[in-house]
Amino acid sequence: MIGSEMSTDIQQQLDTLREQLAYHGHRYYVEDNPEIPDAEYDRMMQQLLALEAEHPELMSVDSPSQRVGGTPLDSFTQVKHELPMLSLDNAFNDEELNAFEKRLLDRLITAGHVSYCCEPKLDGLAVSLMYENGVLVQAASRGDGATGENITTNVRTIRSIPLKLQGEGWPVRLEVRGEVFMPKKGFDELNARALKKGDKAFANPRNAAAGSLRQLDSKIAATRPLSFYAYSVGVVEGMDLAESQYERLVQLKGWGIPMCPEIRQLKTINDVIAYYQDIGERRQSLAYEIDGVVIKVDDVETQEQLGFVARAPRWAIAYKFPAQEEMTLLNNVEFQVGRTGAITPVAKLEPIFVGGVTVSNATLHNADEVARLGVMIGDTVIIRRAGDVIPQIVSVVESRRPDNAQAITFPITCPVCESNVERVEGEAVARCTGGLFCQAQRKEALKHFVSRKALDVDGCGEKVIEQLVDREMVTTPAGLFKLSAGIVTVLDRMGPKSAQKLVDSLANSKETTLPRFIYSLGIREVGEATAANLANHFETLEAITAASKEQLLVVPDVGEVVANNLLNFFREAHNMDVVEDLIAVGIHWPAIDKPEEGVELPLDGKVVVLTGSLSQLTRSDAKAALQALGAKVTGSVSSKTDLLVAGEAAGSKLTKAQELDIEIWDEQALVDFMNR
């Protein structure tokens, strides 16, 4: 009995210390308004650490002590995002921003106006934080938007991120999305410490933040001055959030999640432009690096009406600041050959620090761009990081041109294989005619073929492809599938286990889908979305290869240029040989599953809303099942809603559906309907 009372007393001490440390940590790291001296905070933390060391059975994942880091990891595991983490389209001037609003209004078919939620575009790393019953259970990087890395142990060390939400009334599951960044002051102090120890300094705060989040040892991450601001939500289960983007962030702030103090609700696009100008003027005085502002439609229901394109929401845009510029010398020009044979002039520059990185190369794109710039070897040029990412030559300082400046001469034969170079009428790009005979094209074509979005061959990276081509072990995509583990072991850093893993991965990749196969062929201008549209429209590879231009133009996302590229590709005998060889080595895919003509789907055209927590299905599985039955799944209840599927703890959406006399199913009713 005494032991039980003692255990209860210790648990109460731990709970009190954890609660006080969480409160004072929030006051210090988020509100910048400490209530107690640092020494008192440190004393409480030491007391907590001592108690937890004595009673490890009472350890809690949301304890403030978890911020100091744990046992180093061997590697990061992959995390599949339940909802994709999309990127944003960009605007670089007021005209492009006004065009963005016009697209919104045209799509909404309204002459009215749209209100916006605006925020600085932080130069950091996008992350997803998953809270279950108020406790942080997982943090993941954005990755490619569909799959990221599990960085939970590192994110737990970020003091401004609550390990447990404050207050009450939060959703059962809540995914918070935001930006991890390193404030300027912390970055400067980190680099000063590194230089003092003789270590290499980070180039910019973004690189420092990225390097910190990818530390396998979270104790190192815990020493880095990282911070976080939320900018949106992903998965929400168990209750409905506010119908305003801005108000949702205010809700998050009430639960202890940091919100950028510069976020504003604005009524008109002119207000947005004024906000952009104001933030731009104050950019250097802000505590963190930014490269523009993000503009989002504020009303969540309107966001859902606008929807998404392949990689970005239609309802948001990043308005970038003019890129930083510097002057440097153009020492030489080299010509690179790309996957489709495009020959690109690359300027070799005197290294210059611009926009946070050292730049020594910049693309000159093509002969038209060289002529437009009037640039010569030996010139002093102004270099800019377009969108603060891609180095670009924007002009020549002709007053500094030396007497020995040389004109840039384009090759008439390929610099790699010496095949003829041709420039098709109406195109700016010159191309090598060598095809797979050209090593450069062969390498790039094979790299594309095995890439994640194509055949997704694990263990077949760039260096492996380069060695296979350089050693003339593979000349066509089909040749990859004829490799044996014994042959592959001759490659650098390729032991028997790695070789067998590569061969097994190649064998597994033979089972693919028609959209992936079309994309893997590397047809110019045919991306993932176009490949999927072609597959869904024609259903078979034979129908695609035999299609006329008129038939191709009927396909969504296929215009004149793409149609011509498809026709030209499949008319080339050597391209059809590549396709037939791939089929011959066993590449295959399931038939496209489409409903029979004239067959009406059970929920065809019905507008369905999902709400509450589901126990038998995941939210994504339920949505996919409803869509397969013909339904249009939306996120908010309105007079247009035909059906509400309500799980446990359904909130205001259920109430609204009842008020509007909308048909309501529970989860079991949906499962039964699916199994009919």
From Swiss-Prot:
Catalytic residues at K121 (n6-amp-lysine intermediate)
**Limits of the BRCT domain:** 598-676
Q: Which SMART domains match?
A: BRCT (SM00292), HhH1 (SM00278), LIGANc (SM00532)
Where do the annotations place NAD(+) binding?
A: D38, A39, E40, Y41, D42, S87, L88, E119, R142, E179, K296, K320
Q: Which UniProt keywords apply?
A: DNA damage, DNA repair, DNA replication, Ligase, Magnesium, Manganese, Metal-binding, NAD, Zinc
**Enzyme class, spelled out:** ligase
Reaction it catalyzes: NAD(+) + (deoxyribonucleotide)n-3'-hydroxyl + 5'-phospho-(deoxyribonucleotide)m = (deoxyribonucleotide)n+m + AMP + beta-nicotinamide D-nucleotide
Q: Which GO terms describe its cellular component?
A: cytosol
Q: Which cofactor does it need?
A: Mg(2+); Mn(2+)
Q: GO MF terms on file? A: DNA binding; DNA ligase (NAD+) activity; metal ion binding
Chain residues that bind Zn(2+): C414, C417, C432, C438
Q: Name one Pfam family in it.
A: DNA_ligase_ZBD
Q: Name one GO biological process term.
A: DNA repair
Task: Specify whether DNA repair is a keyword of the entry.
Answer: yes
Task of the protein? DNA ligase that catalyzes the formation of phosphodiester linkages between 5'-phosphoryl and 3'-hydroxyl groups in double-stranded DNA using NAD as a coenzyme and as the energy source for the reaction. It is essential for DNA replication and repair of damaged DNA.
The UniProt entry, under HAMAP family, shows:
DNA_ligase_A
The cross-references to PANTHER family, in alphabetical order and at most eight, read: CHROMOSOME TRANSMISSION FIDELITY FACTOR 18, DNA LIGASE
What family does the Swiss-Prot or TrEMBL record give for this protein?
A: Belongs to the NAD-dependent DNA ligase family. LigA subfamily.
Please identify the protein, giving its name as recorded: DNA ligase
Could you tell me which species this protein originates from? Photobacterium profundum (strain SS9)
